[in-house]
Regions:
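Conserved PLP-enzyme active-site core in the AAT-like
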Residues: 1-60, 122, 126, 135
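Conserved active-site and cofactor/substrate-binding residues in soluble primary-metabolism enzymes
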Residues: 8, 27, 39, 43, ...
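General beta-strand structural signal in soluble alpha/beta enzymes
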Residues: 13-16, 129-131, 158-161, 168
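Short beta-alpha connecting loops at secondary-structure transitions
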Residues: 14-22, 46-51, 71-79, 99-106, ...
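Structural motif of enzymes handling amino- and sulfur-group chemistry
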Residues: 57-127
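Conserved PLP-binding catalytic core of the aspartate aminotransferase-like
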Residues: 125-152, 170-173
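Noncatalytic alpha-helical scaffolds and linker/capping helices
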Residues: 150-154, 159-177
Length: 177
């Protein structure tokens, strides 16, 4: 469905696994990912997980690099806090295993289609979409005052980054209603 960010020239990519079965929790906690090109890997904090093969030649993930600076070179450390997010990472992993590649594709396709449909409907109503490329989140340029008041009355939670923008994010639980 999507190409690797490296094909677009990205040197560093970050993202969240909250979508993979982790309930919303006021912005966290949830596991995330951080990836970079090989030439930058020694400049990033924390640990690097690499792909390898297990004893049966199946693809497997393993800790490929852990900077020891936080233990032995504290004055030059790029990180000194390691939060255990293992449970959340396992939950996200199990969500992926449960749904499988086809299931994940279907979920992501459904979410993206909802975003496209909403964008078309909002365009018909005269609203201007700011972000030309989107997957699940629309940025609408408008005066937010009246819309915010109506949304709060109906207990709809939008994100308002400024007085003229509404961000609407959709997920697998979003409906046409």
């Amino acid at each position: 469905m999507l190409e690797s960010p490296g094909t677009f020239g990205a040197d560093v990519v970050v993202g969240t696994t909250q979508r993979f079965g982790i309930p919303m929790g006021y912005g966290g906690p949830h596991a995330a990912f951080f990836a970079t090109r090989d030439k930058y890997k020694r400049n990033i904090p924390g640990r690097i997980i690499g792909k390898t093969k297990d004893l049966n030649e199946n693809p497997a993930l393993r800790m490929a690099l852990q900077t020891r600076e936080q233990h032995i070179k504290r004055d030059r450390a790029t990180s000194n806090i390691c939060t255990a997010q293992v449970l959340l990472a396992v939950m996200a992993g199990m969500y992926v295993v449960y749904h499988g590649p086809k299931g994940l594709y279907n979920i992501s396709y459904s979410i993206h289609k909802k975003a496209i449909d909403l964008n078309l409907k909002l365009s018909e109503l005269g609203f201007k979409q700011i972000n030309k490329h989107f997957f699940d989140t629309l940025q609408i340029q408008t005066n937010i005052l009246e819309i915010k008041k109506q949304a709060e009355l109906k207990k709809v939670n939008f994100y308002y980054p400024d007085q003229n923008t509404i961000c609407i994010s959709l997920n697998e639980a979003s409906t046409v209603k």
